[in-house]
Amino acid sequence: YFNLNTVFLYPHSFNDSLEYKQQNSTITGMVGNGALFGKMFLSKPALHLGFSNSRDKQNVGIHEFVHLIDMMDGDCDGFPEKLMEYAYAIPWLNLIYKKIQEIKNSDSNIRDYGATNKVEFFAVASEYFFERPKMLKNKHPILYEKLQLIYQQNTAEIRVDVNIRKKDLCPCGSGKRYKRCCLP
């Protein structure tokens, strides 16, 4: 990321002034701009929680890195221009506005914070794309398709947390049982 020089891990959530243990310390992640350009600030407990629970569609690390991707064209606007051809601009923005309205009407399982604006929608939808891709593909197929285009990957087809037993066929494709093939 050309627009990231430093990542700061804070021991707790923090406030706009980057102070923690204050009454208004509710921020768990932030990408700097202006004088703080090139810096990312993350709450270490929130970061750990995001990666320890991959089913809640919430991950501050993913969320803040998506803001960096969004900012690669110079604007944090919910539209990653460097990753999408111009022909996709209007359909993408129309989809964002439609999905934000669904969230506001409680007609969506996308996290409420995504209705804040198109910038946060892109980050929240991306968390969903990486944490619960099969659910996103099932419940929001057009959104999944657009995010797949943006990120150039089909996350719904990635096998995660596969529990292989010794008697199962080996996932390497040899046709042998796992215990007689690739079992470490």
Question: Model-found features: residue ranges?
Answer:
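Metalloprotease/metallohydrolase-associated module, dominated by Zn2+-dependent proteases
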Residues: Y1, F14, E19-R55, D75-K167, ...
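Extended, charge-biased low-complexity segments
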Residues: L4-V7
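A general secondary-structure junction signal
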Residues: L9-S13
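Active-site recognition of the HExxH zinc-binding catalytic motif
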Residues: D56-D73, A123
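Short cysteine-rich clusters marking metal-coordination/redox-active sites
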Residues: L169-P171
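Extracellular repeat turn/loop positions enriched in glycine and acidic/polar residues, especially those
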Residues: G173-G175
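Short cysteine/histidine-rich zinc-coordinating motifs and their immediately flanking basic loops
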Residues: C182-P184
